[in-house]
Amino acid sequence: MAANTSSEIKIENALYAVHCTPDTGIFQILSKAGNLAFIQEGKWTLAKATASVVSINHPVYGAGKSILLTGQESTASITLFDSSPFVFFGGNSLNTTAQEMIINEYAPHQLSIQINEPVSAIRVLGTAGLKKPEENPGSYTFLAVGSVEHRNGIVAGWLTQDRGNGVIFSERKEDAVLLRPQIDYGRLVIPAKSEAKHETLVVGYFDDVRDGLEKYADHIAAHYAITLPRIPSGYCTWYSNPHGGANDEKHLPELAAFVQKTLKPFGLDFIQIDDQWQGRSRDRGELDRRGRTDDYLGKPKDEQNKKWWWGPHADFTQHDPEGPYPSGMTSAAQNLSTLGFIPGLWLMPFAWDPLCDTLIDHQDYFLKRADGGLYYAKWAGWCLDITNPAAHEFLQKSIQRITKEWGFNYLKLDGLWNGTGANLLYVNDGYVKDDLGEAVAYDRTKTPIERYREGLKLVRLAAGTDVFILGCNVSQNMRTLGGSFGLLDAMRIGPDNGPDMNSLKAGPWHGSNRYFLHGRVWYNDPDPVYLRASMPLEHSLLLCSWVALSGQLTVMSDWLPDLPEERLDIAKRILPNHGLKARPVDLFEHDLPQVWILTDTQSGVRRDVLGFYNWDEKQDTTITYTAEKLGLPDAPRYAAFDFWEKKSLGVFEKELSVSLPKGSCRVIAVRPLLDHPFVLSTNRHITQGIVDITSENWDSAANTLSGSSKIVEGDPYELRIIVPAGWSADTIKSETPDCSAAMTQTDTELRAVLRSPTSAEVRWDITFKRT
């Protein structure tokens, strides 16, 4: 199509039609399904542009068409791909001058959104939580606009964040929601007579916003070619009481031996040593400045605390010889490996101490201020400048030492935001303006996000693909959310939690808010579960049930040898991780969702498990939803079973109503009622068959229910089977040697118990007869 500036240009695919007027930079996007102009009006910041339509073929998204707009100082594009449910927005900035150009932030356009709902019935979901559009302070990376009642709406998200950090702002404008996407670069350098490509934004309309969020995450995974390893479950030493922090070389073997016997058979496979193992540097009593001034070291101008430099020791090249592991970290890792565990270690790859013996003569390894002093970020400390080739080599060798020489195959990387050279904003959820770009790097052509991503790539290169890498944590500064895409196996998606009710909700809130990233972009880490006897049992069940059902990283951090048997059994019922993708039911109804659903069909039948959570520790509640709203398959009647109460809830029809005492939960397996016997639940795992049943079959000719189950040695395995009226159990057998089988039927419920002296996949058969 020939270039023009005035006439309307149109592109379309099966889902959308885009109309654009180049002369004004105004465009409109319609969803064909309901003939809805969900972007009523979009407006590029460039005007008087020439335009053309081109056909493209993308290596990831395939065939498509783009509207290309070209102005004097920038270009813009709107693209539709045949295979994608999103509209893609891109652009370039042009530097036509003879001097370099610096861009700190870039706001390409604004979008007026309408989803056929009054604005009063709409909420936006972003990193700041569930808000009215006008109350959103700005969301990092993504923002969803949805109907509270109907779930329809739009999802907008930055697909790429390779050089800049994506933010989306919202406001209410009469009967519409106005979105303003923005990229914060900090400092993007465009050389003379050159141009810079900006990040890519995607926007799409969906009947269920959850579908859109999940597909957005799928697009990120496709763009960055993300392939996740198997999700592990494990133990972190930090919160344990006693023996917290890094634990020590006397008590860690005691813990590991106990876990090997009690929880490893159920699926606990890593043990990670946390902070306080490392070489001494910053002394928490008094800082040895070694001839440097506070000003050189970066003391903040407004800081009144005499211990402004307080934070973790930050020399990760060696252990503290007077610390918890005097025999060294190689010995610690070997002791864990010998017992069959993946050894894990905490460190801060981008935060190091310039005053430690290792680095005192290498001040050039650190980011600087404009006046030549060191740039300091509160708590984590001084920032390694990865653009300096010598610092680059130093970090590479440090990671290789930890993984290849010491033998740690699980890394927990704390203080990640130091890699961007920006403020600590903890706890950071909604957008906060920071000092991104003010720190001075060796290579000033690299943006802060670019430096950060290169640092993470270096860690992966040095560690190898067989090392599991967990980032920690986005709440220190949310620049690390999108900046980490494609470079980590897991990410702490919130701040530190704790065993008290207010603190334990931190993981579920952040893990719900960002649920769609889990299992697609990385594994969400909500911080550990707690089982300690000092904690109310119902609160332990509440947190454990949420983590286990949501499928997010399951980590324990109590002194497990002291757990009462009842609480140790809870740990067994949440291991291993099911490895699937659950979703919240009420994502746009409650800031902290109260209902989750997990669905699986791997065993040949569909299994649905619902989690109901009362996060209020002062008030009882009742939650009622229709089967359709819950996401259950269409059926006239359903059978339900309460896992923790170990009892059948009978049959319900169109809706399920659940009563919850304050600060409690219920985990309920649901299946459509059939005209023959079927397995509704098991006692092995909170998912009630999803983790353990590998097959289930009904033979109508032989009146036989058969299947295979993964059984743990010495753990009585119970099948909870619904037996419709007119049937009774006749015989039961196990085809696995040494595995005993027994059963008891009461009315319409059968309990079949299998016992195996070894962990094995057991084949079982139960015959029935008509009564």
Descriptions of predicted regions:
Residues 3-16, 20, 30-31, 36-70, ...:
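Polysaccharide-binding surfaces and accessory modules of carbohydrate-active proteins
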Residues 110-122, 628-645, 722-737:
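Solvent-exposed beta-hairpin/edge-strand motifs
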Residues 12, 83, 106, 141-231, ...:
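Beta-strand-rich recognition/accessory modules
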Residues 652-690, 746-771:
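C-terminal beta-strand-rich structural cap/linker in extracellular carbohydrate-active enzymes
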Residues 359-393, 397, 446-565, 589:
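Glycan-recognition surfaces
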Residues 231-400, 406-410, 416-431:
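Aromatic-lined carbohydrate-binding/catalytic grooves of carbohydrate-active enzymes
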Residues 168-179, 635-655, 731-753:
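Solvent-exposed beta-strand/loop surfaces of large extracellular or lumenal domains
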Residues 87, 148-150, 547-550, 555-557, ...:
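Carbohydrate-binding surface patches
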